[in-house]
Amino acid sequence: MTDTRKQRAAVILAAGKGTRMKSPLPKVMHAVGGRPMMDWSIALARQVGAERIVAVVHPSQDVLIAHLGKHHPDVAIAYQDPPQGTGHAVRCAEEALRGFEGDLAVLYGDSPLVPAATIEDLFGTLSDKTGLGVLGFEAEDPGLYGRLITGEDGSLEAIVEAREATPFQLRVRLCNSGVMAGRAADMFRLLAKVTNSNAKGEYYLTDLVGLARAEGIRCAVAVSGEDDLIGCDSKADLAEAEAIFQQKRRRALMEAGVTMVAPETVFLSHDTQIGADAVIEPNVVFGPGVKVAGGAQIRAFSHLEGAVVGEGCSVGPYARLRPGTVLAANVHIGNFVETKNTAMGEGAKANHLAYLGDGTIGAGANIGAGTIFCNYDGFLKHQTDVGEGAFVGSNSALVAPVRIGDGAYIGSGSVITKDVPDDALAVGRGQQITREGWARNYRAKKAAEKAARTTDQNKKG
């Protein structure tokens, strides 16, 4: 079957100052689910098949501009300076979309939770007769939201701001999200007719509805849930969006077979992957880039980021897995163990109080309590390799670069600076000296000294 769907493009509005965030960081660079809000909007545009994406930014947003250049080099950048409203912002993207003849969606860089299915529905309202679609939501408390006024046939007749609405219109709960889609050529042509004859002296995107209808272009409405369309203008909004995201992701994972003992205390990232029948205990934080296989157990108060956890592993409680950690099946990581850029083979164990950085640990190896991989010399990081079935005794320091051979034993309390062959024993510690009766004589001597000092002080007093 031939795909007759029109080409798609997206303009993402991100030039707002975000003064209510009270932060030097551009508003759209604040994160939800461990991901900048701008990245959520770019991902949304990609999910709905936008072949061309334009980010409208302010020239002063150096952090945002650098981020786009590094992580999204295919996203075109258009500058809005000074900001003069949403309609003006979209017009700033016109040059970047020169020659584009498909459908265009206008998205917002501070709305991180819009589902792709919702934008598909919005594009779906467009047809030969319907040239403009607006995304709305049924507000629990419409308040100051603009109202979407529809006709008997369901078409959109007007967007009315709350301050200009009649008492009858204020009873309407269908509100404007600001997200819009239409034929790109028509949208830019109509935008050229928008004026700034209003109290703020700005060019409003919402004016397109009246201009389109005046030309006989039908306008339509697609509806989404209110939570999906939350915009984040303040830290309070950001926290609300985070709570919505976490609740939805937790539920999705539990419905997929993940056990969460206290789900409200588990915090996930946008890309967290957890397999069926894994168990997540209370107060666990997943930073970006974590993949947990089925049957694994992540115990309480653990923090994972950039880590891969194999099937049947046990992690924690109070463990920290940092980026580059890869655990094969049935690995045990216990309390107060930190790993970074380290791979552990099947069945390897580090059950207590250890730092394992920049290393490999072979299958079945045992890392004793208090073991430290001394990986940093003040300038460079170095590698520690522990072979299969090796045993590292408690309170050992392995000074990298160093290799512990397969089946080798390291005596407790050792400082190891040289490679250890397979099946060898290495002990690097001071020799024990035992003096029988020394403690008894020492106590008697000190007791006498104390008594003499007390007698002398009494004479002086």
Curated annotation (Swiss-Prot):
Mg(2+) binds at residue 110. Binds 1 Mg(2+) ion per subunit. GO terms for cellular component: cytoplasm; membrane. GO terms for molecular function: glucosamine-1-phosphate N-acetyltransferase activity; magnesium ion binding; UDP-N-acetylglucosamine diphosphorylase activity. Acetyl-CoA binds at residues 369, 375-376, 394, 412, 429. Residues 236-256 are annotated as: Linker. One of its GO terms (biological process) is regulation of cell shape. It catalyses: alpha-D-glucosamine 1-phosphate + acetyl-CoA = N-acetyl-alpha-D-glucosamine 1-phosphate + CoA + H(+); N-acetyl-alpha-D-glucosamine 1-phosphate + UTP + H(+) = UDP-N-acetyl-alpha-D-glucosamine + diphosphate. The keyword Nucleotidyltransferase applies. It comes from the Bacteria. The keyword Nucleotidyltransferase applies. Catalyzes the last two sequential reactions in the de novo biosynthetic pathway for UDP-N-acetylglucosamine (UDP-GlcNAc). The C-terminal domain catalyzes the transfer of acetyl group from acetyl coenzyme A to glucosamine-1-phosphate (GlcN-1-P) to produce N-acetylglucosamine-1-phosphate (GlcNAc-1-P), which is converted into UDP-GlcNAc by the transfer of uridine 5-monophosphate (from uridine 5-triphosphate), a reaction catalyzed by the N-terminal domain. NCBIfam families: glmU, PRK14353.1. This is Bifunctional protein GlmU. It comes from Hyphomonas neptunium (strain ATCC 15444).
